[in-house]
Amino acid sequence: VISHDKPINIFEETTGHMPKASIQTMLLGRPLATADAPHQTIGKLIGLAVFSSDAMSSVAYGPQEMMLILAFAGAGALHLALPIVFAIAALLLILTFSYEQTIHAYPGGGGAYIVARDNLGELPAQTAGAALLTDYILTVAVSISSGVAQLVSAYPLLFPYRVWVAVSMILLIMVINLRGVKESGFTFAIPTYFFLVLMFATVIFGFIRYFTGNLGVVVNPPSMGIDYIQPLSIFLILRAFANGTTSLTGVEAISNGITAFKEPRSTNAGRTLIWMSIILGSLLLGITFLSVHIHALPSESETIISQLVRTIYNGRGLFYILNISATTVILIMAANTAFADFPRLGALHAGDGFLPRQLTFKGSRLVYSGGIVALALIASLLVIGFQASVTKLIPLYAIGVFLSFTLSQTGMAKRWWKAGHLKKDEEIVEPGSIVRFDKGWVHKMLINGLGALSTALVMTIFAVTKFKDGAWVVIILTPLLVTIFFSIHHHYKNLAKQLSLENHPTPKRIIRNRVIMPVSGVHVGTVAALQFASTLSNDVTVVHISIDPKETQKIKDKWELWGDGYRLVVLDSPYRLFLEPLLEYIDKISAIQAPNEIITIVVPQFIPKHWWTNLLHM
């Protein structure tokens, strides 16, 4: 039992220290105090831009990648894109209802990780987290690569430089996000709404031309670049459906980012989700319908969007340039959704001890800087490795997010089951929320259950049809990441157990402190270090590793003058090793120390005035 007979003195004060002006503050803005955090939230309009740009921008590549697969059966098979896109819209409707319930059940943030952790356990939670983290990285790579593809459609001369253009865009978004969520929200709102206005205007004008009978078809369509025609099969249709479902990968972003919204958070986030789904569904249906009727052909050299816009506006005039520019920008902005959610999810994992704790630290602008920089770095490596090709990246995409969809919806279905079997005055307190009796639990459980079954089916289709194309990488990577997460968690648990004061006996009073101080020579620094060591104990041993007999003799001579009576131990090292003889000596002293003794190692360090001169002393 620890005695408390001594007075406890705890003093607390707030320091007024602010980081000094630097290149970082010039790029990122003035540092924000922790008290500024409540003011760094956003409303529905900004929230729609920040968290929906990923989903909205997918209309630029979702229909294209779906039609690209159908094109393997010949241009005549492209009409099947219409029933496929209606099936995707139905799936979007199911997901919207499912995630709207999640948002209200988890007002503190209801991503797949939290829902799975609270309702299914740690293994499903880490699986969902690994899948989502992987998907966010791929979101950045795919969105930026698709944005560059739009740019190349308008300016073919940029094709050889597409990889470095993509990497530059990723770094630009990284810097913007390091400035903070509020500033990045305002930055991204204008181009997002600019894209929506132009795209809806284009679709509406296209339908007007269609219904008046003067829409026409694509003039000078690009080559599809397909060497041979395959027979139309169920497997091919399922592959096209799997590619098209990549348009739904951004649906979960709002439920992950609830804490970024102003109060009432759940209401604002829920309404934003509904508006996002309406906009996404409308654009998906409209763009696919018009693309099929103008006989647009999927191609690496020109995107479906480019063909659609130039057909509707009769050429590459002002409206074409505006639409392609807006599409390019929204695809770049889509990567911002991942930059908003990846650091938060990483911080959640780190807070639970499954990722390095450094990811929980907020930078000078109240954002998780470590997560933002890590995301930019890994996504850039992916873009370089896959040469900024959307077609090559797509097979890796979506399987992870549909796995997280499935786990999230399964967790929610289990939550409603628990809620339905509670008494009216009962509640279960979980880390992410509080479960109370809900009279509508059956209805809600069925909605989330349907969502889980639907997304599990899509995930299976994607895994089977895209396995050879690259889905196998994600299938292997996800359990590997989960293994790494649990290894990190095991380390933190062991460390916490070792450091725990629970059941810890009263510390024994130290009766002796032995000080060992290694030195390379006798000079002003050595004398100062010796004076410091002598304040710790009267038992000070200075150790010199001898690799040059002449230098050692000089040190002995100086020690007689400056050693102040303290002992000097010289360890000869015939093979010029330094660390090993020193550690061996420390082990020898440790072996003979008494129970109430401690050993302190004092290591004098030379700190040069200029950082670059460190290279001269290594």
Predicted region positions:
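Cytosolic C-terminal regulatory domains/tails of membrane transporters and channels
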Residues: 1-35, 493-503, 507-618
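Extracellular loop-to-transmembrane helix junctions
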Residues: 67-117, 122-126, 142-169, 277-283
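Loop-to-transmembrane helix boundary motifs in multi-pass membrane proteins
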Residues: 122, 160-167, 260-282, 350-384, ...
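Hydrophobic alpha-helical segments and their helix-loop junctions in multi-pass secondary transporters
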Residues: 196-222, 287-295, 408-424, 487-496
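C-terminal membrane-solvent junction of multi-pass transporters and transport-like membrane proteins
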Residues: 222, 358-369, 407-459, 464-467, ...
